[in-house]
Amino acid sequence: MTPAENKALRESMGLTLKWLATRWGVTVQSVKRWEGSRTPPPQIAKDMLDLKRKFDADVQRLVENGDEVVEVPRRDRDCTGSEQSAAWARAVAQRAKEQRGLTMEFRDAKGAEKQ
């Protein structure tokens, strides 16, 4: 996986540099290098491809089983246990929207004020 492919894949799934750095136990700077001038180590490239498979499975599940209106989290703290991050959930829903034409609305945490 080239640095450009690594970055494009991360962005397409709505993942942040910080989220990946935490997942891999490295610094944000290391993740930036793997998207800049250095090829990611094989285990990092494998994990990115594993995340992509999960992302695609989440999209397919939403396409096949989702409602016409899908609620997505506005912030990470509004996520359910199955979502990687709010941006991930929105990216999954957007991809499903492109395939099936569903509508997205924000889901806010219970008791939180709508913004």
Question: Which residues does each predicted region cover?
Answer:
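A short, Lys/Arg-rich alpha-helix, primarily the initiator
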Residues: 1-12
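Helix-turn-helix DNA-binding elements, focusing on the entry/boundary residues of the two helices
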Residues: 6, 17, 28
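Intrinsic-disorder-associated interaction segments
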Residues: 2, 44, 51-52, 82-85, ...
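Short alpha-helical "recognition helix" segments of helix-turn-helix
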Residues: 19-21
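DNA major-groove recognition helix of helix-turn-helix/homeodomain DNA-binding modules
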Residues: 17, 40-59
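Helix-turn-helix/homeodomain-like alpha-helical modules used for DNA recognition
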Residues: 57-115
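Recognition helix of helix-turn-helix/homeodomain-like DNA-binding domains
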Residues: 25-40
